[in-house]
Amino acid sequence: MSSTYSDIVIQGGGPVGLACAAWCLQKYPEAKIALLDRNPVDDTDLVAADSRGVALSHGSKILLDTIDAWPSECADIHRVHVSQAGRFGRALMTREELNQDALGHIVRYRDIHLTLRKALRAIQKTSPHFIWQHIKDDAPAHIDAKCIVHAEGGLFKTQDWVESGRDYGQSALVGLVEVENATPHQAWERFTAEGPLAVLPSHYGPQILNLVWCGSPESSSHRLQLSDAEFLSSLQS
């Protein structure tokens, strides 16, 4: 992309950048908005991409519904059980208590990504000044804008030398676990000395759940080396 001027430039074509572009265009269809996207133009390569579960609040669903960007498949959370390892007591939150359709939702990353791309293409038809630019590492050369939104998950090569992060000494294992006699639409969250452990609903039915297990990098690396039986034993301990 050569030198150009925009009201808003959004850097990053993932779910955050796509949603930001769609909402801005919905409210200001005549605005000069540019989306810089490192993903391919065609959706084909994205269909088999990241299938990890992403937890979204019910408020996020309401917002995404306004731009017709909610995936056709999701796993709803109706109850959340919260506890702390080694401590007595628990907290139980329900959708009935809060008078909500759901407390949250689990969607696959690829599903929300593809749905947002489709929604943005529809909005693009009535937005004459919108530029959706699929870029390479060496582009764009120069852009002027009133506002720049950084929605890029990674770093550009030109940013590698900049101290732009902080090491919190945390990592997480993300995957699926098979369970028995699970209550449908229930999520569990347990706080441990190393960080939170969450077990969440999935698209695959009540017996297959999403797992997010936070811990130190050393602990996470060790858990990755365990056999399935050893991993489950550690998870249940």
Question: Model-found features: residue ranges?
Answer:
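N-terminal Rossmann-fold NAD(P) dinucleotide-binding loop
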Residues: 17-18
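Glycine-rich FAD pyrophosphate-binding loop
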Residues: 11, 23-50
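Conserved FAD-binding catalytic core of PHBH/FMO-like flavoproteins
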Residues: 147-237
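Beta1/beta-strand and adjacent pyrophosphate-binding region of the FAD-binding site
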Residues: 2-14, 34
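Conserved N-terminal helical subregion
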Residues: 65, 74-160, 166-172
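A structural signal for isolated positions on well-ordered beta-strands in alpha/beta enzyme cores
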Residues: 9, 32-34, 81, 210
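N-terminal FAD cofactor-binding segment of flavoenzymes
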Residues: 46-85
